[in-house]
Structures are given as C-alpha cells and as structure tokens.
Amino acid sequence: MFASFIFSGDNKLTEKTIFNCGDLDILVVYYTIATQFRKFLPHYIRWHLYTLLIYILPSFLTTEIKYKRNLSNIHISGLFYDNRFKFWTKHDKNLALTEEEKMEVIRNRGIPADVLAKRAHEFEKHVAHESLKDQIPAVDKLYSTKVNKFAKIMNLRQSVVGDLKLLTDGKLYEGKHIPVSNISAGENHVVQIPLMAQEEILSSSASDFKTAMVSKSSKPQATAMHVGAIEIIIDSFASPDCNIVGAMLLVDTYHTNPENAVRSIFVAPFRGGRPIRVVTFPNTIVQIEPDMNSRFQLLSTTTNGDFVQGKDLAMVKVNVACAAVGLTSSYTPTPLLESGLQKDRGLIVEYFGRMSYVAHNINQPQEKDLLEGNFSFDIKSRSRLEKVSSTKAQFVSGRTFKYDIIGAGSQSSEELSEEKIQGKAKQVDARLRQRIDPQYNEVQAQMETNLFKLSLDDVETPKGSMLDLKISQSKIALPKNTVGGTILRSDLLANFLTEGNFRASVDLQRTHRIKGMIKMVATVGIPENTGIALACAMNSSIRGRASSDIYTICSQDCELWNPACTKAMTMSFNPNPCSDAWSLEFLKRTGFHCDIICVTGWTATPMQDVQVTIDWFISSQECVPRTYCVLNPQNPFVLNRWMGKLTFPQGTSRSVKRMPLSIGGGAGAKSAILMNMPNAVLSMWRYFVGDLVFEVSKMTSPYIKCTVSFFIAFGNLADDTINFEAFPHKLVQFGEIQEKVVLKFSQEEFLTAWSTQVRPATTLLADGCPYLYAMVHDSSVSTIPGDFVIGVKLTIIENMCAYGLNPGISGSRLLGTIPQSISQQTVWNQMATVRTPLNFDSSKQSFCQFSVDLLGGGISVDKTGDWITLVQNSPISNLLRVAAWKKGCLMVKVVMSGNAAVKRSDWASLVQVFLTNSNSTEHFDACRWTKSEPHSWELIFPIEVCGPNNGFEMWSSEWANQTSWHLSFLVDNPKQSTTFDVLLGISQNFEIAGNTLMPAFSVPQANARSSENAESSA
C-alpha cells in the first residue's frame, strides 16, 4: 500500500534493502510511510506519532547506518504510489561517496530542517488537485422552464429527469455517462452517439396496453427532444507520450447530402492519460422513436495510428442535455445557450500541453438558392369508389393539382436566345422583362436581345491556351561585338507588353484586374563553341539616371541566361509584389522597369549579329505577393544578391576568388555605393546567420571545362595556402549543356553570426567575417580560346537569425557588406543634417525655411544664403529610397542644436515644424509644432505610411495620385537655431515590397549649398 522497491530484481522492503539505500531515499520511504499511516490514527495522537516517524526515527537510523551498510557504486530506482492522489514519483540516484565522507556530512550537518517541510507542502498541493470533471453545462443552465412559487422560495431546481418514461412536455432530460461502443484500432470507425439508453427507448415504446392505462389527467408524453448539448468523452488506451493524432466527424445521418450531414470536425491527439472531451451544441430537435440513437454518429480515423490491429484504441461515453418538446409546449433556451454556446457550435477541452482543432460546417441558403430554386407541387387525391348503378360500382381517380415555381436561373441564356430566334412566346419570358410597357400593362424586354442576361461585366482574368494568352512579342538585337556590361534594352515593361497585336493584347489593355503572372519566353540559337551571359531583370520602379549594374537590377526578379547552354529561357513574375493582381495602366503609372543586359560578352565572335525573340504571355499561374517585414525576417528570405563574376584563365594555375558574406551595406568603392532593396533590409540588422543558398551559372561556352571547389573560410588566408580543401567544400563540375548549379551552406558551418556591414578600410586580417571561396580544383581547359567564367548569386537565406539593429557605417566594400538583426528597442538612423546659412542677412528678412522629404531622401532650401546640407546613407535612409512600396509606422526624431554663444536670456528664436504630404501650398498640414526652447530641443513623432495598394504606398507615383511625407521648417532668427538633424526609426510592423532602381549613392560629405542650387536630389 505504501511503497514498493525495485532493487536488483527484489521487490521486498527488507532491512538489507534499507541499509543499502542512500539517506535521501530513506527519508522518502519514511516520509511516505508516515504520511499514509497518519490518516488511520485518531486526531489527538496523529501529529505526535507523525513527528516521531518524521524527525526522530530517521535521525536514529541514519546514525546507525555507518555500522551496517557497505557503500559502493550502486544504482537504485524507487517507485512510490500514493492512493490518495494517484501519484507516481521516481527517484534515481547514484551512490558514489565513501563511507567517511558521507558520515562526516551527516555528523556535521544533520538532516536539513526544511526538507520534510517542503515535501509535506508538495504533498498537500497534489492532494488539493480536483478530479477531471464533466464539461457539459448543467441542463437547467441551458433551458428555462416554469417553476412554481413554492419551488422558487425553496430554491428548488427545475424539473430534471433521467428516465424517458417520466419525460413529459416541459421537462428537462439529462443523461450521464451513457455507454457507447469502443473505438477500434483501425483507420476508420463509426460510433453511434446515443441520446439515452437504448433500453429506455424500447421500454417506453407505445403499446395498446400502455395507451389504455394512461390517465386523462396526466401530462402529455413528449414526442421530441431538443438536443442542446452533447459531451463525448473518449478515454484513450494509448500511451500518454505517443504521437497518435485522430480526426472525428460529427455526422447527422438523417441528411443525405454531405454538405448538410457533416456538422463538425474535431482533430486532437489520441494520447492516453487525460480523456478527450468533445462538447458540441447541435441545436437540433430529434423525434423520440426507436431509431433516435442512430441519428448522430461519430466517425473517427487516425493518420499515424500504430496501435495493434484488433485492439480497442479508446472507450467512449456520452453526456447529453435535452429539453422535452411536445404538442402543447416547446423549449425556452437561456441566453447562455442561445447567444453564447450555439454560436460556438462546439469545442474540444484542451488540457495543458495538448493541442486540438475544431471546424464547423455551415451550409445555410444563399440569396441565389432562393431566387433560382425550382419548386414543384404535384398533389393527387385518393381514388374513390363511386356507385354507377344499383348493380355496378367503379373506382374514380382523385383530383390532381400541379403547380411549378421556376427559379430565375433555371433556363440558360442559350436556350432563351434559341427560343426567341424560333419566335416562340414562352411564359418564362415574362420574368425576364425589365421595363413596364404602359400600353399593354406588362413587363417587356428593353431590346430584342436580352442584354440583361449577357455577361458583359465580366471582370475575370483572361483564360485560354498559350496562344489565347499571348500579349506581345519583342525583338532584342545582339550585336556580334557585344561585351560585358552592354545594355541591350532598358525600358518600361508597359512598352514591352504593347508591341504587336495578338489575341490577348486587347484583353491586356481593357482588363482592370489580371491575376495571372507575366510569363516571358526568350529564344535564340547560337552554336555551342561560343557563349554569352544575358540577364533579364524586373524592378518595380526607377528614379533618375539609375544604375544598370547587374548588382542593382537583379534583386527583385531576375534570370541569368546562357543561350549556348539553354536555347530558351522562361521566367514568370508578379509585377505587383504587394497584391495578387495588376493591370497595364498600373505598370505604366508605377514605372515598372525591365532591363536586358549583357553580363559576359561572346566567348567566340559570331559571323553575324544575333537577334533574341521574347514572347510575353499571361500565365495561368496566379500572382503571389512577396513582401518583407523589416524587423521580422521571413523564412526563406529572398535576397537575389549578386556575389560576383568569377574568371578562371585556362591552364593549371590555381586561381582563388573571395566573396565577402558581409553583404548588408551594398557594393561599391570609396566614393559611391550601389544599393538595392533586399540588401537594404539586411543592413537594418547588426548581425545575422542562416543557411545560405547560392546559384552558380556558367557564363561561357560549354566547351570550356573546369572543376571549381567552393568552401567557407575567413578572408585572411593567403592564395598559396596548401590545404584549402581541408575545409568542408563542394565540387562543381558542369555537364555538357548544364547551365546552373545550386549550392547550400548550412549554418552548421558557422560558429556564430557575423556582422552585416564592415568599414571599407578594414583589412582582411581584421575583418573577422566569413568569406565564400572559389578555387580551381584541377585545371581549366578547352579546344577553343577563352576563360572559364561563372556567376554567383546568393538567392535565399533559410532559417535566418538576426541580432541587434544597425546604426550604419558610411561607405561600402567592393563586393558588398553584411546583414544585421532585430530588436524591440528603437535605434535611430541619421538621415539628414541641415545647417542654416552662415551668411544669412537678417536685414532683408528675419526667417528662413527648408524642407526634408522623409521617404524620398531629398532636401529643399530657400535662397536666403549658403546652406550646408548632408544626406546620410544610413540603413533606413537607403531602405526608404530603394524600396518601391512601403507600409507601416515610421518614427521621426528632429534634434535642433543652437548657437551656444547666445545667452539663455538673449534667446529669441522660434521654429515652426510642419508635416505635410507635399511641398505645395495647396496641401493642408497633417500636423504642426512650435518650438522655442533655448539652445537645443527634440521632437519625436510617428508617421503611418499607408497607401492604396493593399496598404502599401509608392513614393510620388502617378498611380492613385500618391505623394510623400515632407517635413518643413520655418526658422525665425536662424543665427540662433542653426543645426537640424533628422533621424528615422521603424516599428515592428513596417513592411516593404519591390525594388526601385536608383543611381549610385555618393558617400556623404558636407556640401556647401548655394542659393542657385536650392534642391537636393535623392
């Protein structure tokens, strides 16, 4: 009863067993014995004996142990079972102390005073746990019945019965733990949900004897029950730690249509231990009949059931709460049932650590079901025997009544058109006439052709074959002297799509919402003894004289193509990354841009110029948005970061190429930075790590062969290192016409995360960030002249982890920099610095003014003197300029630093700050502040960036007349309020989408702005 010991196969609690146990286990044994023994003693001696067993006897036994036990490395396991709270505990201990050490501890310290007190507290806490109760609400909480005054005074419950024979009109029925058949260990099993015991239904069935015995004064017997709640209790026999998951369908078998029959779907783990409790509120009136228990059924199945076939997986029992419904009375639901539970429809009781899912089927009639339904009435009376003569009679058929109500959608428009052509006047035409003719007092069609029935307002995406969906064809000249970096064509995508007249050309121009992606198929045939690398890139917008470098244009949607390896190139893309639809007018007004450039020139010069043909289609594949939540990176994180073009000359010399993985700060040299949207997102974080997926493309003739080894290492390794391939590496060898290879380096190859941005002047020795190495494994050789050239692009980062926000570093390294991470705190990035004119003439006017474009990164000043302005290339500043679409909260901080030489008592400067959507005077201010604090002040406020494209906004776009956010300053006495710094921060919900092609950003340096050059470009 108290305990059982498992010790070397012996299950007896002997003196030898006790003295071979550790002291802690002895205390547990005596504590268990004392606790159990205490409840059998009288109250007045219970605590005296309990104290004796708990405090005195263990101390005595511990002192005696040193003479009897032989300590060694013994492993014992104790299992204790308590009948009061059904609680198993396990104690494992390795005894490895010497006898002298153990006895010395006991002799000096004794038994800790609070050990037994803590165990007693834990015991009482477990004893206080309540049992697993039924979760079905009480039936009198679901229904309201009439209760006489005496019952109200005595606080009596409503009339609740548990026997069908006593169930009369107005009474409530409550069934507890009605047994149900067990669930077998199979893929599918059907369990009937009884509403009451089957023997009660049979015993209460109507008979002649019972009809004769019913008293006239008795209440009428109930003919039906309103089922308010059913609780299905499933006790699984499976292990409590198994992964069996079951799905259950609650089915109303009186419906034959599955859309009406399936009431609810429940998914829950079929683990043992605690029961599965499914509570549903059917809100169904069930007729009392012998087959009433077969109406509701529970269909169960398991996806990964490993229980032995033929064995029961679980037992099932049911609780029900119903109200009797008869000819003279009905039920009255309480607000709890009608307004609360019936809206929930059902639930699964979730215990701690157990997940469950519930779905309910609702198949209510729609308006079209009422208008288009056909109703037919065909009623015949019974035949009757009529007397014809005194010697003859015959059966006469009864009268017949037939009437049809035909719905509006019962006849197709094709049938109606055919009837009109044939000149047949049908009765059904009357319901189609839409205008009243005063002459004939009837409804007439407006025209001979029923335009109201024609689908002229079809807004669906064009559909059909590839020929039906072809919208345009473009021809791209590829001269025989083309070299790397040549721009073959750079134009708006709308201009590409409006070339030619094909079947879908008109659909493209006249459809408001096109949900299919744009598919381009480029073809050209060139011989295999030459090769060329072309890039087709799509970007959401373009500003100014944007750079067409492959690093800048390939970040959104780009395909690298070597026609010598692949004769045809196919690419599908979504031109609206914020949503799932687009239109031609949208492409025109947002400036969606297409670039086709040559990345690597001809391996061998062809004899004539070449022409590439590009066919444009509307794809049947639907558009999928791709947005970036800046502070919560998606998985996978689409980057499309160009790592570089690697050239390996023919021969046996070992060439080593390094590509830095600190890729967040853009690419460039000391005086300029190339930046795109995904890299700007990465630059928001301080450190990052993840699984890196690279795409390696062959950019020369397939006849040039080489095996290249790729591995990760630090950048300070010398080129003549002899054991490069001691690192984990991947060998790449292209097939005959193979064009691309995908490489993946997991984060297991990186010890920690690394910085996203490194100063340009940092040496390789002091870098400390990993590099991607590419090295010739054997040799590069061919029968034709030319180098072996490959292009490397970092396409996605999987399982990315980012740490800390990045304030930013001025400048960029020559092939890129590195990503950073997230934090809840706001880290401010400096965007702009403005110094009022030093040569300001206060005799002409007492104020000056300037404006900062917060989203576009521009500064506008007046002509009151020589201004000093500075636009910083901070991470947020870069992000706002290269992200085409933006949505979310942007934090703005303005810091004014005044002339410190002015005394506080002499301060006489006032600054007014205006927040507007445009610099035009016709726009009202969104907010206005007035600051007059001497020497310095701060202003912090949020801006909610939101726009028309699924909440995203594009900077100063003609589409939907989008503008920007401008912060204008009116400075009175600018010789005192001199320097203004504008800083930006983003919130957790800030999202971006699409890339804007931008010119290279110059490394910021203080520029003296004259009055003639009054506006700063982005």
From Swiss-Prot:
It holds the Pfam family Como_LCP. GO terms for cellular component: host cell plasmodesma; T=3 icosahedral viral capsid. One of its GO terms (biological process) is symbiont-mediated suppression of host innate immune response. The record marks 463 as: Interaction with the viral RNA. The record marks 446-447, 819-820, 1005-1006 as: Cleavage. Keywords: Capsid protein, DNA-binding, GTP-binding, Host cell junction, Host-virus interaction, Inhibition of host innate immune response by virus, Nucleotide-binding, RNA-binding, Suppressor of RNA silencing, T=3 icosahedral capsid protein, Transport, Viral immunoevasion, Viral movement protein, Virion. GO terms for molecular function: DNA binding; GTP binding; RNA binding; structural molecule activity. This is RNA2 polyprotein. It comes from Bean-pod mottle virus (strain Kentucky G7) (BPMV).
